[in-house]
Design a protein with these regions (language model features):
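Interfacial/gating helices of multi-pass transporter permease domains
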Residues: 58, 95-103, 121-141, 167-172, ...
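Alpha-helical transmembrane segments of polytopic membrane transporters and translocases
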Residues: 102, 117-119, 131-148, 176-179, ...
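Alpha-helical transmembrane segments of multi-pass membrane transport and lipid-handling proteins
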Residues: 1, 8, 171-225, 253-264, ...
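Interhelical loop/hinge segments that connect adjacent transmembrane helices in multipass membrane
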Residues: 58-65, 71-114, 119, 153, ...
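Membrane-interface helix-capping segments at transmembrane helix termini in multi-pass transporters
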Residues: 1-14, 54-61, 201-214, 323-333
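Short runs within selected transmembrane alpha-helices of multi-pass transporters and secretion channels
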Residues: 8-25, 36-44, 61-77, 106, ...
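Membrane-proximal transmembrane or re-entrant/amphipathic helices at the cytosolic face
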Residues: 318-372
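Helix-loop junctions and terminal segments of transmembrane helices
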Residues: 140-184, 231-237
Length: 372
C-alpha cells in the first residue's frame, strides 16, 4: 500500500509537466479557468463520494486528487491548441534556460521557506502543536487565496504597460492598491475577531488553541496581501525579479533561526511569530528596493477609508459577540452584518474604487435587463 500511495501522489509531479496555466493568466482567460475548475471539482467530488468511503481508502483519495490536478492540465493543453501550435521543430531553448533556472530557484526557496515551519514544528514540538498549526494555516490560506487571486489578474497588464505606457502602469498600480485596501484590511480584522468562534464551529472544542494561532497569523494576510502586489507582481512586471531570490533566501534564514528559538518556548504560536517576522522583513527589503527604483505613487486615501470603516465594522462585530448568541447564529450575524456595515461605511465615505465597481455592476445589470 505504501508504494501504491507514493505512485499515486507522484502522478502530480508527472502531470505538472503539462501545467500551462500561465498562458491563460497572460491572456486573461479567467472565464475558462473558472469553468474548467468547476467542472473538474464537481467530477472529482462525485468520484470521491463513490470510491472513498472509509479511512482505508486513502490510496483512492490520493489517486483521485492527482487525477483531478492532471485533469485541469490536460484540459488546458487541449484547449490551448486553439490558440497555440505545439511543435518540436526549430525550438530555441537556450535563451529560456537562464530565466527558467532563476525562477525555479525562487520557487524552490519559497517552497522551502513555506514548508520549513511544519518540519521544524514536528521536530521541536508535539503532534498536537502540528495539528493546531495546520488547521490555522488552512483557515488563513482560504483568505490569502482570495487576496492573491485579486492581484494575479494585474500581472499581465502591469507587464504590458510597464514596457509600453508608464502612465497607465502607475494608474494600475494605484488601482490595485486601492482594491487591496478595500478587501485585505477587513478580511484580516474580521478573521481576527471571529477566529475563536470559527474554530469551534468548524473543527470542534478540541481545537480551541487554534483560535489564538489564527489570530497571530492574521498579520500575514496584510503582509502577503499587499506584498504580493507591491513586491512580487511589481518585481516581475518591471523585470526586477532578481531581487526575489535573495529575498526568499533571507526569509528562509530568518525563519530557521527564529523557529529554533521560539518553537521550544511557544510551540505552534512560536512558529507563527517566526513566519510573521521573516515575511515582514523580506517584504520590507523588497518594497524599499523597488520603491527606490520605480517611482510610482500610491494614494493613501483608500487605506484611511478602509481603516476607519473597518473600525466601525469591528465595533459592531464585538457587540454581537458580547450578545452570547448560539455559535452558528452569532457567526452568521457577525459576517453578514459586519460586512454590510463595512460596505455601507465605504459608500457613505465615497470610496472611489468601490463606487467604480458598483457602477460597473449596476450598468451591466441594467444592460442585461434591457436585453431581456
Amino acid at each position: 500500500m505504501g508504494r501504491a500511495l507514493y505512485i499515486c501522489c507522484g502522478l502530480a509531479i508527472f502531470f505538472n509537466y503539462l501545467n500551462i496555466d500561465w498562458i491563460y493568466q497572460g491572456l486573461e482567460e479567467y472565464g475558462y479557468i473558472t469553468g474548467r475548475s468547476v467542472v473538474i471539482k464537481c467530477i472529482s467530488l462525485a468520484l470521491l463520494v463513490v470510491f472513498v468511503k472509509t479511512r482505508e481508502d486513502y490510496v483512492a483519495y490520493a489517486l483521485l486528487t492527482s487525477l483531478a490536478l492532471g485533469g485541469n492540465y490536460i484540459f488546458n493543453v487541449i484547449h490551448a491548441r486553439k490558440m497555440v501550435g505545439f511543435t518540436l521543430v526549430n525550438l530555441k531553448i537556450r535563451k529560456h534556460i537562464k530565466p527558467i533556472v532563476f525562477i525555479a530557484g525562487i520557487i524552490f526557496m519559497s517552497t522551502i521557506y513555506n514548508k520549513i515551519d511544519i518540519t521544524m514544528l514536528s521536530a521541536l514540538s508535539t503532534d498536537e502543536a502540528v495539528g493546531y498549526y495546520s488547521y490555522a494555516q488552512r483557515t488563513v490560506n482560504i483568505v490569502l487565496t482570495m487576496c492573491s487571486a485579486v492581484t494575479a489578474i494585474f500581472l499581465p497588464r502591469l507587464s504590458y504597460y510597464y514596457d509600453n505606457e508608464k502612465a497607465v502602469f502607475y494608474k494600475l498600480m494605484d488601482k490595485g492598491f486601492q482594491i487591496l485596501c478595500l478587501g485585505v484590511v477587513p478580511l484580516a480584522v474580521g478573521l481576527f475577531l471571529t477566529a475563536n468562534q470559527a474554530v469551534v464551529l468548524l473543527y470542534g472544542d478540541s481545537f480551541t488553541p487554534t483560535g489564538t494561532t489564527i489570530k497571530l497569523m492574521c498579520p500575514l494576510i496584510l503582509i502577503k496581501g499587499f506584498g504580493d502586489l507591491l513586491c512580487y507582481q511589481l518585481a516581475y512586471s518591471s523585470k526586477n525579479e532578481y531581487i526575489l531570490l535573495p529575498g526568499s533566501a533571507i526569509a528562509s534564514i530568518i525563519n530557521v533561526i527564529t523557529n529554533s528559538i521560539l518553537i521550544p518556548l511557544y510551540a505552534q504560536n512560536g512558529a507563527v511569530i517566526a513566519s510573521v517576522m521573516s515575511e515582514l522583513t523580506t517584504n520590507i527589503i523588497q518594497f524599499l528596493y523597488l520603491k527606490r527604483k520605480i517611482k510610482y505613487h500610491i494614494s493613501n486615501t483608500a487605506l484611511v477609508l478602509s481603516l476607519f470603516s473597518t473600525m466601525v465594522m469591528a465595533a459592531v462585530v464585538c457587540a454581537i459577540i458580547k450578545m452570547n448568541l448560539p455559535l452558528a447564529v452569532a457567526l452568521a450575524m457577525e459576517i453578514s452584518i459586519g460586512g454590510a456595515i463595512y460596505l455601507l461605511m465605504n459608500i457613505a465615505l465615497k470610496n472611489r474604487i468601490l463606487s467604480e465597481m458598483l457602477t460597473k455592476v449596476l450598468k451591466k445589470h441594467n444592460t442585461g435587463f434591457q436585453d431581456s
